[in-house]
Every structure is written in C-alpha cells, then in structure tokens.
Curated annotation (Swiss-Prot):
Name by which UniProt lists this protein: Outer membrane lipoprotein BBA14
Spans through the membrane: none
Keyword list, A-Z: Cell outer membrane, Lipoprotein, Membrane, Palmitate, Plasmid, Signal
Domain of life: Bacteria
Membrane topology per record: Lipid-anchor
Signal peptide region: 1-19
Origin species: Borreliella burgdorferi (strain ATCC 35210 / DSM 4680 / CIP 102532 / B31) (Borrelia burgdorferi)
Main function: Outer membrane lipoprotein that could act as a component of a potential toxin-antitoxin system in B.burgdorferi which could serve as a plasmid stabilization mechanism in a growing bacterial population.
Additional note from the record: Is a highly immunogenic protein recognized by sera from Lyme disease patients.
Length: 121
C-alpha cells in the first residue's frame, strides 16, 4: 500500500506532536466593572470564578506535566466560603474573597508559566 500524501501526513503529525508539548498561556485577569449594579457585579463575580478555575487547572495540569518535586505549593479555592444569596453585599463579599485568592495564586501561576513555558519536554 502506497501513501500518496506522506509528506503532508508527516508534517501534520509533526505539527500535532510539537503543539502538544507546550503549556497553556495565561489569560488576563478580568477587569472591574464600570458600574456597581447587581447585574454588572454578578457578571464580574462569574468572570473571576472562571479565572480562578483556569489558574487552578493550569497549576494542577502543569504540576502533573513537569513532575518536579520543587513545584511551588498552592491551595485550591474553597467555594464553601462564598455567599449563596444574590444581594449586592454578598456579591461584593464574594468578589473580595475571589480577588484575595487570585492575589495568592496568580504570582505562582506567572512564575510557573515563565519557568516552564519554553522548557516542557
């Protein structure tokens, strides 16, 4: 059996292999809303939650991939600390808790990204 598109398939396989050997990039932290309405703050809270989940997933997956015993310690966000009701006060409390956790893990994620983004085998 002869493969007619061998160069193309070789190039495609090489591209897939090399593209999978890098770690994900880090997105920008969501910016604060212009207005302090319930809707705007709720959306901001959701964006911060997504951002934390991304950072945590990045850290966990990178830790597994690099398998380095000197990998920095980090804690996962405890969602049980979030208020369940949708009042302005509760949402502002949740935003403060989310931003506090981001302030703790973002520097670790940035450090890991800078260290390993080009050095993944």
């Amino acid at each position: 059996m002869q493969i007619k598109n061998f160069p193309f398939l070789f190039l495609l396989n090489s591209l897939i292999i090399f593209s999978c050997s890098t770690i994900a990039s880090l997105p920008e932290e969501p910016s604060s809303p212009q207005e302090s309405t319930l809707k705007a703050l709720s959306l901001y809270e959701a964006h911060l939650s997504s951002y934390i989940m991304y950072l945590q997933t990045f850290l966990v997956k990178t830790k597994q991939k690099v398998n380095n015993k000197n990998y920095p310690e980090f804690t996962l966000f405890d969602t049980s600390k979030l208020k369940k009701d949708q009042t302005l006060k509760s949402i502002k409390t949740n935003i403060a808790a989310l931003k506090n956790h981001i302030d703790k893990i973002k520097p670790i994620a940035m450090q890991i990204y800078k260290k390993y983004s080009k050095n993944i085998p």
